[in-house]
Curated annotation (Swiss-Prot):
GO biological process: G protein-coupled dopamine receptor signaling pathway; heart contraction; optokinetic behavior; swimming behavior
GO terms for MF: signaling receptor complex adaptor activity
Gene name of this polypeptide: gnb5a
Protein name (database record): Guanine nucleotide-binding protein subunit beta-5a
Organism encoding this protein: Danio rerio
CDD domains reported for this sequence: WD40
Source organism superkingdom: Eukaryota
Assembly description: May interact with RGS9; this interaction stabilizes both proteins and increases RGS9 GTPase-activating protein (GAP) activity, hence accelerating the deactivation of D(2) dopamine receptor-mediated signaling.
């Protein structure tokens, strides 16, 4: 009688699967390398370098009682929503620095906030694991909390949220390792996105009008590009050495940048399916918390944990400016919709408008 085969130990099968996946990964890298025929800085050699340019703080927005964690511009290029560790969400007029609305959330650490495309609502959330939408009205004295609508529920903290191209749907990312698309009206989940192995920290929607993709980054050091219709991860990039804190699409939608705790920002080309540039200097040793592109895509602004904002020439990979002003780490940064200025939020409790 044939000797009975020993049942495979769970540990053995796991080890073989891991080595198989590592082999497949290295094969993939080899295939990718075959298409890798030119570097971005070589292509950009003939392009004129940017000179040093001066940007100054034009406005300082004071009113939060604790660390500013997130901010977003309204499409009207004038209003800003910001959220803070003090549990407050404030809508500002960036021209006059006046506060137009303020909401106190039931929890502290409001890590995510977003303006609706119409400018008539804001969404926010954080340690309450929820994403809440507040409709804004012209009546400045109205109690916004009474009109609150809870849209999304995760099983861990909400790390980021953004509306799709309408007020009717909202994308969220969470510490539970997932992203999800929700219907604002009904609060139903329309699609969930599983693929990260740890907390998802950031997301950004593709800029095209038909924007059916978005990118997310997280504590698994991985950036994933997702198809919103199928819920599938269509591309993933793993080259950072630490958490990815921020991702932002290039204005054309063909690439995206990421900022990480490994003190680098990186540019990934979606068509070439690989990393094409690293923005780093030996003197920069603190993590990048947030990144955003200028309207032309030539500049990349990075907010860092050493209280500075570094401005990079995207094509040349060189730093063209360094901005001082904040007195604690820069936690969030967004370029205004018309590209004339950008706003940064910091753990020093303030927001600054630079131009």
């Amino acid at each position: 009688m044939a000797a009975q085969e020993e049942p495979a130990q769970p540990g053995d099968s796991l080890a073989t699967l891991k080595s198989e996946s590592d082999t497949l990964k290295s094969k993939l890298e080899e295939e990718r390398a075959k298409l890798h025929d030119v570097e971005l800085h070589q292509v950009a050699e003939k392009i004129e370098a940017l000179g040093q340019f001066v940007m100054k703080t034009r406005r300082t927005l004071k009113g939060h009682g604790n660390k500013v964690l997130c901010m977003d511009w309204c499409k009207d290029k004038r209003r800003i929503v910001s959220s803070s560790q003090d549990g407050k969400v404030i809508v500002w007029d960036a021209f006059t620095t006046n506060k137009e609305h303020a909401v106190t959330m039931p929890c502290t650490w409001v890590m995510a906030c977003a303006y609706a495309p119409s400018g008539c609502a804001v969404a926010c959330g954080g340690l309450d694991n929820k994403c809440s939408v507040y409709p804004l009205s012209l009546d400045k004295n109205e109690n916004l909390a009474a009109k609150k609508k809870s849209v999304a529920m995760h099983t861990n903290y909400l790390s980021a949220c953004c509306f799709t191209n309408s007020d009717m749907q909202i994308l969220t990312s969470s510490g539970d390792g997932t992203c999800a698309l929700w219907d604002v009206e009904s609060g139903q989940m329309l699609q969930s996105f599983h693929g990260h192995a740890a907390d998802v920290l950031c997301l950004d929607l593709a800029p095209s009008e038909t924007g059916n993709t978005f990118v997310s980054g997280g504590c698994d050091k991985k950036a994933c590009v997702w198809d919103m219709r199928t819920g599938q991860c269509v591309q993933s990039f793993e080259s950072h050495d630490s958490d990815i804190n921020s991702v932002r699409y290039y204005p054309s939608g063909d690439a995206f940048a990421s900022g990480s705790d490994d003190a680098t920002c990186r540019l990934y080309d979606l068509r070439a399916d690989r990393e094409v540039a690293i923005y780093s200097k030996e003197s920069i040793i603190f993590g990048a918390s947030s990144v955003d592109f200028s309207l032309s895509g030539r500049l990349l602004f990075g907010g860092y944990n050493d209280y500075t904002i570094n401005v990079w020439d995207v094509l040349k990979g060189a730093r063209v400016s360094i901005l001082f002003g904040h007195e604690n780490r820069v936690s969030t940064l967004r370029v205004s919709p018309d590209g004339t200025a950008f706003c940064s939020g910091s753990w020093d409790h303030t927001l600054r408008i630079w131009a």
